[in-house]
Swiss-Prot record:
The protein's name in its UniProt record: Postreplication repair E3 ubiquitin-protein ligase rad18
Enzyme Commission designation: 2.3.2.27
A GO cellular component entry from the record: chromatin
Disulfide bond residue pairs: none
Record organism: Schizosaccharomyces pombe (strain 972 / ATCC 24843) (Fission yeast)
CDD domains in UniProt: RING-HC_RAD18
Swiss-Prot/TrEMBL catalytic activity: S-ubiquitinyl-[E2 ubiquitin-conjugating enzyme]-L-cysteine + [acceptor protein]-L-lysine = [E2 ubiquitin-conjugating enzyme]-L-cysteine + N(6)-ubiquitinyl-[acceptor protein]-L-lysine
Pathway annotation: Protein modification; protein ubiquitination
Pfam family, one: SAP
Domain SAP stretches: 240-274
InterPro entries: Rad18, Rad18_fungi, Rad18_UBZ4, SAP_dom, Znf_RING, Znf_RING/FYVE/PHD, Znf_RING_CS
GO molecular function, one term: ubiquitin protein ligase activity
Length: 387
């Protein structure tokens, strides 16, 4: 199946087995709602895409499904689910075409008498044909041979290594010899061949690429050898609060990433790159570094459009023109506030200067002068001169 094909679990509603919708949904990520890509399982047994869960845990340290506490270091690869998904994606188009309900035109209903007559006539003819066919020895022998072939085919199973039909009681010996041999036997060397090409008899008629699936599954056990050791080292996270802007910029420069922008932009760029790089290591077929850088640039472009402010217009003349009225209003408010404050201080100073004060700083109180009595004049006038 092509990765660009848009599929949805509701596609199975118009097939002969609508319950396959549940199987299709269980193979999709709860975050991006697409088929798992490098699935990782959490400590609470939930599975997500490697990139989706790493990007989510960067902002929310919890499981998106059950909200349980989770850390990126606890994530583990879900290899068996990835193999099941690869097989399902191969057979999905053929399975969908096989189970698709065809729009067959409804037959025109006839009169009841005619229908009954035709049914009875056809029934009599079929009964006579059955009697004639069953009575001949050749037909009996043919039927016996057909039944024996059917039973013989039911006793056969597919070898998971070479996809050949092998009797079920000999599958263990055949599997040992098939895996130990330097080259697996080809499907043409098997004495049993699937000759049933009819789509209506069995699901074994699907033309799937079993050999390629088997090879990918066998290679999964040696997935550690797919990348060199130096390319499989995961990038550590950084504590940006302890790093200066120049240090973060140098880290990005060492990785060959853009170094323009302010510190917050550099932090987001580095964090996104760590998520992209580490999730790419979980892929069976990791993409190149150039592809990852292109994804990072596309992500930054989308982020800048969502904010609605272009980088080159920050602090420019367009910004001043757009908010000129707001700036003028803020300036007027600041001037008015300063004027009111100065008037208040001036009035307070005038009031304090008009009040008399003592040396100790407190206002002076009005005190009447002391009463003085001239004792000399009063004493002379009353007694007179003495001789």
């Amino acid at each position: 199946m092509n990765e660009l094909d848009a599929t949805d679990p509701s596609d199975w509603n118009q097939t002969k087995i609508p319950s396959l919708k549940g199987l299709d949904s269980s193979l999709r990520c709860l975050i991006c709602h697409e088929y798992f890509r490098a699935p990782l399982i959490t400590s609470c047994s939930h599975t997500f895409c490697s990139f989706c869960i790493r990007d989510y845990l960067r902002e929310h340290p919890m499981c998106p499904a059950c909200r349980a506490p989770e850390q990126e270091s606890r994530l583990r690869k879900n290899t068996i689910l990835e193999e099941i998904l690869e097989s399902f994606k191969v057979i999905r188009p053929t399975l969908f075409e096989f189970l698709k309900v065809e729009n067959v035109p409804k037959p025109v209903l006839q009169a009841p008498e005619t229908v009954i007559a035709q049914d009875s006539a056809s029934g009599d003819e079929e009964w006579e044909d059955d009697l004639a066919s069953n009575s001949s020895p050749a037909s009996i022998a043919k039927k016996t041979s057909r039944d024996s072939k059917k039973r013989k085919r039911e006793d056969l199973v597919h070898c998971p290594a070479c996809s050949n039909l092998v009797p079920h009681n000999q599958i263990n010996q055949h599997l040992d010899s098939c895996l130990n041999s330097p080259s697996s036997p080809s499907s043409s060397s098997s004495p049993y061949k699937n000759k049933d090409n009819s789509k209506s008899n069995s699901l074994l008629s699907f033309k799937t690429d079993d050999d390629s699936i088997t090879k990918r599954r066998l290679r999964s056990f040696n997935s550690a050898d797919e990348l060199p050791l130096k390319d499989r080292v995961r990038l550590p996270k950084l504590t940006y609060a302890l790093l200066s802007e120049s240090k973060i910029r140098s880290k990005l420069s060492e990785m060959g990433l853009p170094t323009d922008g302010h510190k917050q932009l550099l932090q987001r760029r580095h964090a996104k790159w760590v998520t992209l790089y580490n999730s790419n290591l979980d892929q069976k077929q990791p993409v190149s570094k150039r592809n990852l850088i292109r994804q990072l640039i596309d992500w930054e472009r989308v982020q800048s459009k969502s904010i609605g402010v272009e980088k080159e217009k920050l602090g420019g003349g367009d910004w001043e023109k757009a908010y000129a009225e707001d700036f003028a209003d803020l300036i007027n408010r600041a001037k008015q506030s300063t004027t009111n404050k100065n008037d208040s201080l001036r009035n307070t100073a005038v009031e304090s200067s008009t009040e008399p004060s003592t040396s100790n700083g407190f206002p002076a109180t009005s005190v009447s002068p002391p009463l003085t009595i001239d004792l000399t004049n009063s004493q002379t006038g009353s007694d007179g001169p003495q001789s």
